[in-house]
Amino acid sequence: MFQGETAITVDDKGRMAVPTAYRDLVTRVSGNRLVLTYNPFEAGCLWLYAEKEWERVRDDVMSKPNTQRVIRTLQQKLVGSSAVLELDANGRLSIPASHRNAVGIEKKAVLLGMGDKFELWSEQAHRALIQQTLSDGDLGDELLDLRL
């Protein structure tokens, strides 16, 4: 399980170091490979999955009939735009320029461990996310019994 927030620096070639605390786990569960894709729900954010979890997500998304526009868009953003990334010998991932540019990641980014995946945010989008507050009206009935 991935959890926690880490400030990340992205070099001129689009490489980012995976935090040391996660490297062994990524190697163990995914053989040094992660799958990168767009977060279809929030701008400024990419998702990184271990391959096995990605296969489950991909298969689930692609099992839906693409006769509805929302399903096609989800399939395009998640599966059609995905890229398999491999940790190099220095524990870095090369984030494709197309993905970095689409979400506004330049030199600074934020990596969030979100249980079964990572979220990679542009620094600006992450700051905006953190500054948002939730009100009781934002929580659905299924969340009202959460003890935080």
From Swiss-Prot:
One GO cellular component term: nucleoid
Single Gene Ontology MF annotation: transcription cis-regulatory region binding
Coiled coil location = none
Q: What is the lineage of its organism?
A: Bacteria, Pseudomonadati, Pseudomonadota, Gammaproteobacteria, Lysobacterales
Predominant location: cytoplasm
Q: Which InterPro entries match?
A: MraZ, MraZ_C, MraZ_dom, MraZ_N, MraZ_sf, SpoVT-AbrB_dom, SpoVT-AbrB_sf
Compartments (UniProt record): Cytoplasm, Nucleoid
Q: State the family named in the UniProt similarity comment for this chain.
A: Belongs to the MraZ family.
Any GO BP: negative regulation of DNA-templated transcription initiation
* Name the record gives this protein: Transcriptional regulator MraZ
Q: Where is the SpoVT-AbrB domain?
A: 5-53, 82-125
Q: Which gene encodes it?
A: mraZ
Query: How is the quaternary structure described?
Result: Forms oligomers.
In the UniProt record, the signal sequence range is none
UniProtKB keywords: Cytoplasm, DNA-binding, Repeat, Transcription, Transcription regulation
